[in-house]
Amino acid sequence: MKILILGADGMIGHKISQTLGSSNHTLILNSRTRSEYLNNFISNATFSNYDFLKQDVTELLNETNPELVINCVGVTIRRGADIIENAIKLNQKLPHTIAEWSSKHSKKLIHFSTDCVFSGTKGNYSELDLVDAIDNYGLTKGKGEVQSHNTLTIRSSMIGREL
């Protein structure tokens, strides 16, 4: 299977890339700036450096034509969610653009969201609870969640290192 991983150098993306790097899948790893680090531990992949703040993701999707897109892109709290324009573009709009392309081309999308879509005041949240984030990160990630027949959105709570 041809798999495109977006945000391949982030907390989630680099572990998925590392795991799938030992498979027989054809991998395309996108990192805005750090593909040289990925190349140190994944040798059987193609690398791209699209910056989705400046470039249209559909260019990369059309160029690579993956069967599966794994979207791990996100403007996190410590990486500038206070720059609301970037958070809106990457956390909120980008997933819907990818989902639209995936649906149009009969491809699959796995999109990573976050438990930060919840304020934390209620506790014991389920997937049926309404999003009630109070910060820019949670608000934009919540609005970026995709519900489509060809899409799996995963709300995860990840704390860890990036490359």
Language model feature labels by segment:
Residues 1-24:
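N-terminal Rossmann NAD(P)H-binding glycine-rich loop of SDR-like oxidoreductase domains
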Residues 46-90:
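NAD(P)H-binding glycine-rich loop region in Rossmannoid oxidoreductase-like domains
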